[in-house]
A protein has these predicted regions:
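Active-site- and interface-proximal helix/loop "cap" or "latch" segments in soluble metabolic
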Residues: 22-95
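Structured beta-strand/loop patches that form or line metal/cofactor-binding pockets in enzymes
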Residues: 1-37
């Protein structure tokens, strides 16, 4: 119900670039993720609360994927059952 959908996946050298469409229950529409092995290099949200999504992206940069999932999974936004951070955790689980 709240799952993200992978829409793009490419590897350039050691860097994996992956894009996900969010579930439609959150303000952001897309999440672009760059990883190097098990480490998140960069996250970019399309749509959503600009300050909050930039904050989440800055906090997870340099973090291991498993740690980010553990910290973000299950965060709820206004009773929606998911949130932009939770959508990122769901996307990271698909990597």
């Amino acid at each position: 119900m709240f799952e993200v959908r992978k829409i793009f996946d490419r590897t350039e050298g050691d860097v994996r670039l992956t894009a996900f469409e969010t579930c439609g229950q959150v303000c952001s529409r897309q999440i672009d993720i760059e990883t190097d092995g098990e480490v998140i290099k960069q996250v970019r949200y399309t749509g959503g609360c600009n300050g909050n999504t930039q904050g989440v992206a800055a906090l997870v940069a340099g973090m291991k994927i498993d740690e980010a999932i553990a910290r973000l999974e299950g965060i709820d936004c206004n009773g929606r059952g998911t949130s932009c951070p939770d959508q990122l955790a769901r996307a990271l689980k698909q990597l």
